Amino acid sequence: ADGYARATGRVGVCLVTSGPGATNTVTGIATAYLDSVPLVVFTGQVPTALIGNDAFQEVDIIGITRPCTKHSYLVKDVADMPRVIKEAFYLARTGRPGPVVVDLPKDVIQATTEFRYPKKVELKGYRPTTEAHLGQVQRAYQLLSRAKRPVIIAGGGVVTSGASEEL
């Protein structure tokens, strides 16, 4: 999923089983977080009634990955799936890209619902910055235009965002 996202610029997706399947994704999720790679990771989970009861292969993947994801969801109602999936992909690719975990209990996966995506994503408090601060850009320009031997060290985000030529 990480390689796909890096190669295409699109959101990478993976689906893993509960327990060890979920925990084996942690290094990849952390790498994607540090490198700003957009991922949506779907993890299996024990049925909702067994969460918190130390069930076989129950893992708190939300808690484990909290420090290295943009957001995590534990879907407890199948009716929430369209909204959660739409939000997960939106969050993974907007602002600074990064991984989002969607934890899916077995009973939720087995349930059925009418699947209609919401037309738009409405997340309270989430306002990704999409434009540079004009004052900072002007200051950088002034410093670079006066420099005798300027050096710019730019991260991979320049390539990912397609701004190489502009830089």
Q: Where do the language-model regions lie?
A:
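N-terminal alpha/beta PP-like core and its mobile active-site loop of ThDP/TPP-dependent enzymes
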Residues: 1-167
